[in-house]
């Protein structure tokens, strides 16, 4: 829909959690749109639970993940999609912004499908995280590979090898003590760029009409201003 209303935007703002270079002169790569609760010192694990954000296509990994958590004396808090049969140590959590944030900030580690926004938050707070991209989701596979290369506390789980031993092996490769890139909140920068763009557009409206701005974030969709 945004491409329909703004097929050739004068300015494109793309939110990513990685230090990427734009490939067009009218494109700007911004940091993730961080929620206020996320900052570098926000992660405070309590030794009580693991958090998972999963969708139907990757739920076959759940038994091994829940068993691993159980062996280590942890509850598994599950967000997203749920299976018909839920292991005893799994708590199916309803969709809740505040609940998810609190559980994420206090979890020992997390597992997720490598969405851009969530990976940006993971990169910001430094929580150990395992990515399981959904089958056929090329963007998630790219996100997972970039996150694994960028952050010492992010690993990728092989889609066909899920066991307690494999999870132990993956988690053993994660480092929470190594230096990691500083993730900047992209929301303020986005607002400043939009304000500058609109001010310039107003000043030049009599001679140079603009086609709009395209702001791209994965989980929150695309937004256009024209």
What are these regions (language model features)?
Residues 2, 65, 100-101:
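Acidic, amphipathic alpha-helical patches
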Residues 118, 123-176:
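Catalytic binding pocket for nucleotide-activated donors in carbohydrate/polymer assembly enzymes
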Residues 11-13, 28, 77, 93, ...:
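Hydrophobic/aromatic beta-strand patches that form the interior of the parallel beta-sheet core
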Residues 81-123:
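Donor nucleotide-activated moiety binding/catalytic core segment of transferases
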Residues 168-226:
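C-terminal amphipathic helix plus adjacent low-complexity
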Residues 54, 63-94:
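Catalytic donor nucleotide-activated moiety binding site of glycosyltransferases and closely related
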Residues 1-58, 81:
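A nucleotide-sugar donor-handling region in carbohydrate enzymes
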Residues 34-35, 80-83, 96-98, 134-139, ...:
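Short, acidic/turn-prone active-site loops that include or flank metal/cofactor-
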């Amino acid at each position: 829909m945004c491409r329909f209303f703004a097929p050739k935007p004068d300015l494109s703002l793309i939110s990513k959690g990685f230090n990427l270079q734009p490939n067009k002169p009218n494109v700007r790569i911004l940091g993730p749109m961080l929620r206020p609760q996320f900052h570098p010192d926000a992660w405070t694990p309590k030794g009580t639970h693991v958090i998972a954000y999963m969708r139907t296509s990757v739920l076959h990994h759940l038994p091994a993940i829940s068993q691993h958590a159980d062996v280590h004396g942890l509850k598994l808090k599950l967000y997203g999609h749920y299976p018909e049969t839920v292991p005893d140590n799994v708590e199916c959590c309803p969709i809740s912004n505040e609940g998810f944030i609190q559980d994420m900030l206090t979890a020992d580690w997390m597992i997720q499908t490598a969405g851009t926004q969530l990976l940006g938050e993971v990169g910001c707070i430094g929580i150990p995280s395992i990515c399981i991209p959904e089958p056929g989701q090329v963007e998630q596979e790219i996100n997972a590979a970039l996150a694994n290369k960028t952050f010492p506390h992010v690993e990728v789980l092989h889609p066909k090898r899920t066991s307690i031993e494999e999870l132990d092996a993956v988690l053993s490769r994660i480092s929470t003590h190594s230096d990691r890139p500083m993730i900047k909140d992209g929301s303020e920068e986005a607002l400043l760029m939009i304000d500058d763009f609109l001010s310039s557009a107003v000043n030049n409206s009599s001679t140079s009409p603009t086609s709009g701005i395209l702001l791209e974030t994965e989980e929150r969709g695309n937004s256009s201003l024209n």
